[in-house]
């Protein structure tokens, strides 16, 4: 069937990337919040955009996270910046979580949301200004991609370059240790394996309720 509406382009026949309040560049994943707002990881522009209903073709976003405004797309390692964001999810309290792949971390943003706001918490790194590329640890991430919450509020993070999925349990805190690892025998291994227990460059994760 044909799509009924398009975001990121003025019409169904355009395909150009743009750094504007209505443009997108390499969008990866989307999620709806409890109010029906649509959130998009605009990966090529290093940002997350919120679109509020009613939706319309080529409409402008209402809010941007990861950049100070709608025309910037720079890369940085701060509490308010993103570098190649991919996974996106909301927890049961309405907090927004973003997998910041290029910075090797997952960020939590608490409402009320605002343009260019700072994150409240970071997983995968010791602070908001550090990017550590090191062997796997219980708290480290290397190119996190997909993220999802289960019905108990546990956060699953696909740790792509470490060939594993980590489970973090609430209550969450900066640089906390994961409670569980899937795809590896322990928290210090990163072996690629085509077995019932192994993983190799995983990208996405889901939860069954």
Regions from the language model: what does each represent?
Residues 1-28, 54-86, 112-145, 171-209:
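Gly/Pro-rich loop segments of beta-rich domains
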Residues 22, 80, 94, 148, ...:
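Active-site helical microenvironments for divalent-metal-assisted chemistry
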Residues 32-35, 90-93, 149-152, 209:
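Residue-level detector of Asp-centered blade-edge/turn motifs that repeat once per structural unit
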Residues 37-39, 95-97, 154-156:
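Conserved beta-propeller blade signature
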Residues 42, 91, 100, 150, ...:
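Acidic active-site catalytic centers that drive phospho-/nucleotidyl reactions
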Residues 43-44, 53, 101-102, 111, ...:
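Short loop/turn segments immediately following the C-termini of beta-strands
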Residues 46-48, 104-106, 163-166:
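Structural signal for beta-propeller blades
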């Amino acid at each position: 069937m044909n799509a009924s509406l398009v975001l990121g382009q003025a019409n169904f026949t355009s395909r150009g990337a743009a750094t504007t309040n209505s443009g997108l560049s390499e969008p990866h994943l989307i999620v709806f919040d409890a109010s029906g707002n649509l959130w998009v990881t605009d990966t090529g522009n290093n940002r997350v955009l919120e679109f509020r209903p009613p939706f319309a073709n080529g409409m402008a976003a209402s809010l941007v996270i990861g950049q100070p405004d709608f025309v910037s797309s720079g890369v940085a390692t701060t509490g308010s910046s993103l570098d190649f964001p991919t996974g996106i999810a909301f927890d049961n309290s309405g907090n927004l979580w973003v997998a910041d792949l290029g910075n090797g971390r997952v960020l939590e943003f608490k409402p009320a949301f605002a343009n260019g706001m700072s994150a409240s918490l970071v997983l995968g790194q010791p602070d908001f200004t550090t990017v550590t590329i090191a062997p796997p640890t219980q708290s480290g991430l290397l190119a996190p991609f997909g993220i999802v919450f289960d019905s108990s509020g546990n956060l699953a993070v696909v740790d792509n370059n470490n060939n594993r999925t980590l489970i973090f349990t609430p209550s969450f805190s900066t640089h906390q240790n994961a409670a569980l690892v899937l795809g590896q025998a322990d928290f210090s291994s990163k072996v690629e394996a085509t077995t019932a227990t192994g993983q190799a460059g995983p990208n996405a994760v889901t939860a069954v309720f």
